[in-house]
A protein has these predicted regions:
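Active-site-adjacent beta-strand anchor residues
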Residues: 31, 143, 168-172, 199, ...
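Short alpha-helical
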Residues: 36, 73, 77, 88, ...
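Hydrophobic packing residues within well-ordered alpha-helices of enzyme cores
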Residues: 104, 179-182, 209, 229
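Conserved small-residue-rich beta-alpha loop and adjacent elements
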Residues: 121-193, 242
Length: 243
């Protein structure tokens, strides 16, 4: 599996300026994904997901546990990055990162229940037993919001990773640096780079993500964009969740 975070196209492609909304100052710029780079990331995610699904659940839990620990250890840095790019007061940013841990703990405590086999029934003489087992669905797209990227994103990418799926995570273009921080923490925690990948950019990058044959798309954002996603997902019978 790849071990490097791919944050967009090669030098010379489109760039996104990250602007501090409080001061108007440009913090930095980042590479914006093109349809070609999104397609390449999807292909890597497909390969990575197959390997990730074979990883023992306790080992996947260990990676997610470590991700949570790293986030709590680096609250000040993560909060400063979040406030700097989207304008939230620093106390609210700290509280958001702190609150991330409760979400992680919930999913860690319940993933075994979600993945446990269920007895669906048996015939009268007991010779036939029906059971339901659960498997990962594959590669999912996670399009997150600008205002609470840790809360909104983690509600999708944490359970997705725990249950053996790969994630193409598209933060809002107004929370791109926070997306990079999340990806760095994931990799440091042991999640393979192909299994959790960033898609950076605005509507064009989001459209390119939706063009991939995803197993599911999870979106938080505007009504207008959500409607377009729902229509596209319906045409392909793709799993979809909108907020």
């Amino acid at each position: 599996m790849s071990t490097a975070i791919d944050a967009g196209p090669a030098r010379g492609g489109a760039r996104i300026e990250i602007v501090n909304p409080a001061t108007g100052a440009v913090i930095r710029d980042v590479a914006e994904d093109s349809p070609e780079t999104v397609a390449r990331k999807f292909a890597r995610a497909v390969r990575g997901q197959k390997e990730w699904a074979r990883v023992r659940i306790d080992d996947r839990k260990a990676c997610v546990t470590r991700f949570g620990q790293l986030a709590q250890e680096r609250i000040e840095d993560l909060a400063a990055t979040l406030s700097g790019e989207m304008g939230k007061p620093i106390t609210q940013s700290r509280n958001e990162v702190r609150g991330l841990q409760a979400r992680i703990d919930f999913f860690l405590a319940n993933v075994h229940k979600v993945l446990s086999e269920e007895e669906a029934g048996a015939d009268a003489d007991g010779r036939l037993e029906e059971r339901i087992s659960y498997e990962p669905i594959g590669v999912v797209g996670n399009v997150s919001a600008w205002n609470y990227p840790y809360f909104v994103g983690s509600n999708v990418f944490i359970p997705a990773l725990l249950t053996g799926n790969a994630v193409l995570y598209k933060p809002s273009e107004y929370a791109s640096l926070t997306g990079l921080k999340i990806a760095e923490l994931m990799q440091e925690a042991g999640v393979p780079a192909d299994v959790f990948q960033l898609v950076l950019g605005g509507g064009g990058a989001g459209a390119a993500l939706l063009d991939q044959p995803l197993a599911g798309i999870f979106f938080t954002g505007s009504y207008a964009t959500g409607r377009k996603i729902a229509e596209a997902a319906a045409r392909r019978l793709m799993r979809v969740q909108l907020e």
